[in-house]
């Protein structure tokens, strides 16, 4: 299997993003987006997926975090898709249940080449909840769905994320990110029993 490494840069009038990703890493993570809670979530994602992940982002956080979070998620998805390459020899499917105190989240991944995202189960108060700030740039949890959609669509994977139950917005969001991390780790792992592309069609 060739090196599964990617580097993607994206610059707009709203942000400048660089993501470096090694799918066969050991969880070495260096994240700086200017949004502390989002840094925390991306660090958890890289660590629990055992990816080596570097994310450097500068955006118009003086307005709010939305553009930076959205654009970083787009570039992360692009890097994931690029690093996957021809997808030969991978497991393709992965899923994980992750508890965090009172919360339980589940994620399921299909590295299918058909982008789709289902995000369900978050309690209604996460539409209005904010984490962090005071001082610093706050993270509005309403963007959680958009993060996962952006990753899935740009990586061209099917990603389902659901919250079975939970109350605390920090615990819910973190459990979601960790569930996605563990599901991705399983899906992209080499399968010694698979030599080609894991599809009856012969391509993904």
From Swiss-Prot:
Main location: cytoplasm
Name of the protein in question: Imidazoleglycerol-phosphate dehydratase
Localization (cell): Cytoplasm
Documented EC number(s): 4.2.1.19
Pathway field: Amino-acid biosynthesis; L-histidine biosynthesis; L-histidine from 5-phospho-alpha-D-ribose 1-diphosphate: step 6/9
Enzyme class, UniProt record, top EC level: lyase
Family annotation (CDD domains): IGPD (cd07914)
Keywords: Amino-acid biosynthesis, Cytoplasm, Histidine biosynthesis, Lyase
UniProt KW Amino-acid biosynthesis keyword: yes
Ranges in a coiled coil: none
InterPro entries: IGPD_sf (IPR038494), ImidazoleglycerolP_deHydtase (IPR000807), ImidazoleglycerP_deHydtase_CS (IPR020565), Ribosomal_Su5_D2-typ_SF (IPR020568)
């Amino acid at each position: 299997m060739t090196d599964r490494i990617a580097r993607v840069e994206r610059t707009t009038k709203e942000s400048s993003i660089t993501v470096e990703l090694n799918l066969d890493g050991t969880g070495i993570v260096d994240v700086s987006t200017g949004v502390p809670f989002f840094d925390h979530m991306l660090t958890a994602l890289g660590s629990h997926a055992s990816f080596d992940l570097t994310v450097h982002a500068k955006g118009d956080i003086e307005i709010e975090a939305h553009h930076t979070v959205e654009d970083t998620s787009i570039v992360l998805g692009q890097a994931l898709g690029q690093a996957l390459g021809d997808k030969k020899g991978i497991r393709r499917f992965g899923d994980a249940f992750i508890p965090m105190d009172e919360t339980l989240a589940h994620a399921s991944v299909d590295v299918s080449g058909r982008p789709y995202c289902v995000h369900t189960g978050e309690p209604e108060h996460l539409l209005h909840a904010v984490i962090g700030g005071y001082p610093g740039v706050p993270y509005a949890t309403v963007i959680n769905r958009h993060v996962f959609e952006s990753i899935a669509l740009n990586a061209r994977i099917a990603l389902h994320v659901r919250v079975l139950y939970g109350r605390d917005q920090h615990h819910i969001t973190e459990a979601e990110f960790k569930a996605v991390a563990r599901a991705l780790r399983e899906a992209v792992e080499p399968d010694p029993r698979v030599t080609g592309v894991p599809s009856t069609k012969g391509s993904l």
